[in-house]
Amino acid sequence: MPREVYFYDPPDRFVAGTVGLPGRRTFFLQASKSGRTTSVALEKAQVSALAQRIDELLDEVVRRSGGTSDVPAVAPAELSDTAPLDAPIEEEFRVGTMALAWDADSERMVVEAQALVELDADSDEDLAAAEEALLQDDENGPPMLRVRLTGQMARAFAKRANDVVNAGRPPCPLCSLPLDPEGHVCPRQNGYRRGE
């Protein structure tokens, strides 16, 4: 079966969002354009890392351009998107590998999210070789979401992604673990009393 690539250049909308209550949220990347929507599931840590890396890459683009780039230092207010994910949310795949690149010729950020694939290998070297072969296989590789964004769109995506990650459960002031509405067993209190 040929590889499925969900390609948006540029999308009308590209956001990170969640479904569910804090502590039980499922995280998604969602791209849409002209009535077509693609949603892929991923972990909270992946959303956080993606937002951080996008900001770092954009900062580097601005630094190398000497300030002449169209990339803004902060997310433009007019691109702020706080709307929920577009319904219905149908997961195309769960993300395993992500990649970022900056296309200097078109001044676009390229975000790729590939499906999680389990590989059987006898050694670390075999596993590394199998992973590399799979990622380079343009015809039979895992499904992939590929999105090309302007610098402004990428900054807006990163801001929203950080906001979504930070909108979860507040941390315990003692141990920094997330607090559930009913509290939690705090290791810094020897697990005997519930943190508030």
PLM regions with names:
Residues 1-60, 64:
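The feature marks the first
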Residues 1-27, 68-137, 141-144:
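Intrinsic, low-complexity N-terminal interaction/targeting segments
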Residues 25-30, 50, 54, 109-113, ...:
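Short, structured motif recognition centered on aromatic/hydrophobic residues
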Residues 41, 101, 146-148:
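Generic structural detector for well-ordered beta-strands
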Residues 59, 70-73, 159, 166:
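N-terminal auxiliary interaction/assembly segments of multi-subunit proteins
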Residues 113, 118-183:
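Mixed-charge, glycine-accented linear interaction segment located at domain edges/termini
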Residues 177, 188-191:
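Short Cys/His-rich local motifs and their 1-3 flanking residues in nucleic-acid-associated proteins
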Residues 181-185, 195-196:
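Short Cys/His-rich "knuckle" micro-motifs
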